[in-house]
């Protein structure tokens, strides 16, 4: 009886139903992963889109530079 008084509220649940720990650990992992994905997903996607846009703009600049020749300043004078 003294031991039960010293236990926390969650320890009583685990002692009364041992399957609860298994169920909780089985469900908690995927739920935490889903929560992290929902929180950090938009940030990761935003960084990825920004990186791809930077690379595409760099390729566009390279294509434009290849089409046109640069003029020397001495020839224009």
From Swiss-Prot:
Topology feature Extracellular, residues: 1-24
| One cellular-component annotation, GO | virion membrane
Q: Name one GO biological process term.
A: virion attachment to host cell
The record, for Pfam families, names: TLV_coat
For the keyword Glycoprotein, the answer is yes
Would the keyword Transport be found if you checked this record's keyword annotation?
no
**Its biological function?**
The surface protein (SU) attaches the virus to the host cell by binding to its receptor. This interaction triggers the refolding of the transmembrane protein (TM) and is thought to activate its fusogenic potential by unmasking its fusion peptide. Fusion occurs at the host cell plasma membrane. The transmembrane protein (TM) acts as a class I viral fusion protein. Under the current model, the protein has at least 3 conformational states: pre-fusion native state, pre-hairpin intermediate state, and post-fusion hairpin state. During viral and target cell membrane fusion, the coiled coil regions (heptad repeats) assume a trimer-of-hairpins structure, positioning the fusion peptide in close proximity to the C-terminal region of the ectodomain. The formation of this structure appears to drive apposition and subsequent fusion of viral and target cell membranes.
Domains as described in the record: The YXXL motif is involved in determining the exact site of viral release at the surface of infected mononuclear cells and promotes endocytosis.
Q: How does it assemble?
A: The mature envelope protein (Env) consists of a trimer of SU-TM heterodimers attached by noncovalent interactions or by a labile interchain disulfide bond.
Q: What is this protein called?
A: Envelope glycoprotein
